[in-house]
């Protein structure tokens, strides 16, 4: 009896040992640079979440606003004039002159303005989200946290080849094509070309125009080069150009008020619409759905009204050079040189009526060196 029990224990122990080895082989160590050096995610002392480039492509995440759906306590929101990043519910206002309280770092270069958070994601190795003040390692404008985006690098000594992927989204009638090509040149130099083209027709119907929105057109192109002349020295360079155009808004029209007595704004809008766009007035009543106010469609109907939807166009250009040198005393010296610039034009229908009586155009240019 004792011999049988001993055999059973031995068999159980061996099975458990085998299962443990299988799980150990399946687990992949995640390396991050949240503390300015390469460490295992398990050893990092700060609160950090990581999402890989493969997951970003698999989930169809196009920008940092989409990343917020997967990362706890992180959110990026957009309004007509600005982009606001917040961590744990804390952010800055919509004033475009403000710098964000959440620092954005792309390949080591700090991008301080909210408009730069609209930069699309493509050919990314990983995105690290650090929660809490990060001023000690990342400097100012990281009061609530930091976002560390690491682009995919050329593979020195790797194979010549690449990848192209095509995605189609039925609900938004969106088409996305992206890819990259790795070109090795010798044993210590390689080049990587990557691109992304995205067209999104939107999911809200404009009842007057018969079109959908908000539409988004995005094109991005990146050139990367890596040179490793010795085991101690490596230089990585990348340059990215991008264009982002969006027309329309998810805001539902709420100023076309036919209730009595009419307000000055709604009365003027109705007067103009009745005389210049009579079909608009008829269209409003067709699918208000029994509301007391003829304010257009409800959010539930996923429809909006308007002749001149708001629009925005942003052009970006970013360059980063990273130099890493392992010194003889075991220390590592790193240097980052960067240039980032953008320009944008925003068109806003300020009267919110069917006829664009009052409009406003905003434009700006920005450039930084670091």
Predicted regions and their residues:
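Outer-membrane beta-barrel transmembrane strand signature
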Residues: 295-324
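Acidic, small-polar-rich N-terminal luminal/periplasmic segments of exported/outer-membrane proteins
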Residues: 25-156
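Periplasmic-side early beta-strands and strand-to-turn transitions of outer-membrane beta-barrels
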Residues: 156-158, 167, 180-271, 342-357, ...
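N-terminal Sec signal peptide and the immediately downstream disordered periplasmic leader
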Residues: 1-59, 65-69, 182, 231, ...
